[in-house]
Amino acid sequence: MEYEFRRNSLTGTYLASFSMDHEVLGQWFSEELGPELAKIQQVLDIIKEIQAGKRDSWRLIGGDLTLDLDEEQARIYANALGFEQEYELEESMSLYDAESEAYCGLEDLEEALLSWYEFVQKGR
């Protein structure tokens, strides 16, 4: 999983971009976490608790995206994916949701969060 962090020097906004199949992680980092060090630290602390066996799983529901953590992986997905479709699609049709959902290993997420934390801290 590759990623890149940028900061707009004019607006002060932070932007995370992740590799294909993990694009939604960039949106989650940029929009749901943003530069809030306390929120980033909270997720890092929860990951440590899960790794230590003190907790089985955890969920953080954001404005547009939700983070689910368990002992093995992290799942980030658009809140809209949790809703049932009101209509059925034809057999040959399907909804494209690859940019609305991503999975990664818990350690991979932890590494990316630590990098994001450092990046945000240096930008202050």
UniProtKB/Swiss-Prot annotation:
Instruction: Kindly give the Pfam families that the UniProt entry links to this protein.
Output: UPF0231
Q: Which InterPro entries match?
A: UPF0231
The residue range of the signal peptide is none
Q: Which NCBIfam families match?
A: PRK05248.3-2 (NF003581)
Which family is annotated? Belongs to the UPF0231 family.
Q: What is this protein called?
A: UPF0231 protein Shewana3_0655
Q: Which organism is it from?
A: Shewanella sp. (strain ANA-3)
Q: What is the organism lineage in this UniProt record?
A: Bacteria, Pseudomonadati, Pseudomonadota, Gammaproteobacteria, Alteromonadales
